[in-house]
A protein has these predicted regions:
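Short loop->beta transition adjacent to catalytic acidic/histidine clusters or analogous donor-positioning motifs
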Residues: 1-3, 24-35, 43, 56-59
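Short, well-formed alpha-helical segments that are part of the catalytic scaffolds
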Residues: 12-25
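Acidic helix N-cap motif at the loop->helix transition within catalytic regions
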Residues: 17, 42-51, 73, 93, ...
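A conserved acidic beta->alpha catalytic loop
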Residues: 37-46, 65, 89
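Glycine-rich, basic loop-to-helix element that forms the pyrophosphate-binding segment
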Residues: 63-80
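Short aromatic/hydrophobic "clamp" motif used to bind/position activated sugar donors
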Residues: 85
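Donor-binding/catalytic cores of nucleotide-activated saccharide
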Residues: 90-192, 202-216
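Membrane-interface aromatic/basic loop that binds lipid-linked glycans or pyrophosphate carriers
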Residues: 111, 258-282
Length: 282
């Protein structure tokens, strides 16, 4: 079983070498590494090109303009050749046995998706590990368990490539994980979990998440809610009735009203704001 490791890289010159070397040093050896260089303005491009010269398992995909993580993942998957893929952010890293533990579970269960846990590494050395346990889910539990654990995270999973190609990727620049991973889980034959927490997520103070204000959070959570409502209305209304997505959407609408965003604030996100407004009115 070949695993493609898709690394999205944008202005992560302080972290990208650790990310790449952590995947190259995996105990599971049947891998390829696809790095998507998203028009960085720092030294990221130079670093990954040097790493690619040193290891022929690395393939670099270049964007002609900055497109964000959603596009990066999609283009990386299309350029990959593995049976399964995993996505890794350029400022994160993996423990050396992480991929092997997921592959072992995939071979044991035949699951289209196998998820590990995550370790959230914060500034100052503080960290927190979270995992789902060691279980296999099918039917509606594929989505309900994932949602119930409240860890909406895409990068700690190996996903069958044909499934990743099948599902449209959210290409917005913020809160893009959820509208993608939920449909992937729904389409999967089954979803398996392992207790390995070897995906290390760096809680970076300079990330887009930390730069968001209340209006931006509410806008993109609202768009995410609309995406999921549309998906389940088309595919599985019974699950939609069991998830709090409608109430989540209403909550975001209330926050937006309370924020009373200025024209200047709206103009920062004008295309997404117009999309949100149009979809709410329909």
């Amino acid at each position: 079983m070949k695993i493609s490791i898709i690394i999205t890289a944008y202005n992560v010159d302080k972290f990208i070498e650790r990310a790449v070397k952590s995947v190259l040093s995996q105990t599971y050896k049947n891998i390829e590494v696809v790095i998507v260089e998203d028009c960085s303005t720092d030294n990221t491009k130079d670093i990954i090109e040097q790493l690619a010269k040193e290891d022929n398992r690395i393939k670099i995909v270049y964007h002609e303009e900055n497109k964000g993580a959603g596009w990066g993942r999609r283009n990386g998957i299309e350029a990959s050749s593995g049976d399964y893929f995993i996505t890794v952010d350029g400022d994160d890293w993996l423990d050396e046995d992480f991929i092997e533990s997921l592959v072992r579970k995939a071979e044991e269960t035949g699951a289209d998706v196998v998820s590990g846990g995550i370790t959230c590494n914060k500034e100052g050395g503080y960290w927190e590990a979270t995992c789902y346990g060691d279980v296999v889910c099918d039917g509606e539990d594929k989505v309900l368990k994932f949602w119930g654990e409240k860890i909406v995270f895409m990068n700690n999973k190996i996903i069958k490539r044909e499934l990743g190609i099948k599902v449209p990727y959210c290409t917005r620049r913020f809160i893009e994980d959820t509208p993608t991973i939920i449909p992937i889980l729904w389409h999967a034959n089954k979803v398996a979990y392992v207790s390995n927490v070897g995906y290390h997520y760096r809680d970076n103070a300079n990330s887009l998440t930390h730069q968001a204000n209340a209006f931006k959070y509410a806008l993109y959570r609202g768009l995410c809610s609309l995406d999921l409502i549309d998906f389940f209305n088309k595919n599985d209304k019974s699950i939609l009735e069991k998830l709090p997505i409608q109430s989540m959407l209403q909550q975001q609408l209330n926050i937006i009203k309370q924020c009373k965003p200025s024209v200047e604030e709206l103009n920062k996100y004008i295309s997404d704001w117009l999309e949100f407004s149009k979809r709410i009115l329909l």
